[in-house]
Amino acid sequence: MRNFVKKMWSDVVLGVLFVVSGFVKAVDPVGLSYKIEEYLGMFQLSGWSMFSMSLSVLLCASEMTLGLLLLLRLWRRITAVTVTLFILGFTILTYLIYTDPYGGINECGCFGEALHLSNGATFAKNILLLVVAGLHLWNVFRQAKNNFNYRQIGLTVGVLVVAFFVPLYSYFYFFYVINFYLISH
C-alpha cells in the first residue's frame, strides 16, 4: 500500500485538481470567455477577443483531458510534460497578474465562480503545484515505460469526447435553450 501511495499521490492530486478546475469552468464557458477577454485586454491583445469563446472551450476540455489522463495513468510521459508546461504557463501568467502595477485583474478565474482566490494566493498555489508537477515529471520519467497498446487509444478518445462534451453542452444549452426560451416568453 505504501508503494502504491508513493507512486500515485501526484497523479491523484494533479488529476483531481485539473478535472475539478476544468469541470467548474466548463459549467459556464461563457463566463470563462469573459475572463479570457480580460486577460487579452491586459496584454493589449483585445483584437483576439473574438476567439475567447473557442479558447474557453479549449481550455476547459484541455484541463479535463489532462486530469483524466493523469487519473487513468494514460500516456504518462506526454501527459506529465504537458501538465508541467500548463502549470508553468499558468504560473508565469499569475506572476504577471500579481505584479501588475495597475491591478487590472482582481481574481484569476482558476476555479470559475466556485472558488475565488486573490492574485497572491493564486501565485503561491501555482508555485506549489509547479513543485508537485516537477516531482511528478521526475517520477514518471524514472518509472514509466513506453508501452503502446490500443486500449490507451480507446480510453483517450473516450476522455476527449467527455472533456469536450461538457463545455460544448453548457455553451449550446445557454445560447439555444435559455435564449430561445427568453425570446418566446
Where are these regions (language model features)?
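Internal/C-terminal transmembrane anchor helices
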Residues: 147-178
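Helix-to-loop transition at the C-terminal end of transmembrane segments
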Residues: 23-28, 101, 172-177
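Extracytosolic and intramembrane catalytic regions of membrane-associated proteins
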Residues: 182-185
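Aromatic-anchored segments of alpha-helical transmembrane domains
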Residues: 19-21, 87-95, 161-169
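N-terminal signal-anchor transmembrane alpha helix
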Residues: 3-25
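Hydrophobic alpha-helical segments
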Residues: 10-11, 17, 31-141
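Membrane-interface junctions at the ends of membrane-embedded or membrane-associated helices
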Residues: 1-2, 6, 137-146
